Amino acid sequence: MPKVAYSDEDRERIRMQLVTVGLELMAKQGIQHTTVEQVYKKVGISRTFFYSFFATKEDLIVETLYLQQPKIIKYVQTLMADPALSWRDAVKQFLHACCYGEKNGIAVLTIEEQQLIFKRLSKESYQVFRQKQLRLFGEILENFGIRADTA
């Protein structure tokens, strides 16, 4: 089969599709039950082409988690802006969504999945992930009116 030359725009569009489809599948069926094969087949590319975007499944997982961060912040803001919810109820609803994310379209990592991912990420990817995670948690706390400690 002849190789297809993809423009930078095509590659970026395909990469975004992989991340979006990955997030949809992971939110619906869980991270452990989502396979790389499901993702690349749904996007309509080959396994080899998938790995030109992501070296490992864990790299894809991390990118899907980055993609959902703004969605999580928006969800917190929506809860806090709801006059029908007390602060306590907003926090309770948020925590429930985090624990049962698949029902709310949020991909949630178990402790075991986190540990497995951390082992397989490069040192640089791990550091970037932790920094982005800390920023996310700080922003969540601030949206709930809790001053995040920057230490």
Q: Could you describe each region identified by the protein language model?
A:
Residues 25-59, 63:
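Helix-turn-helix
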Residues 77, 110-120:
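Short linear capping/connector segments at secondary-structure termini
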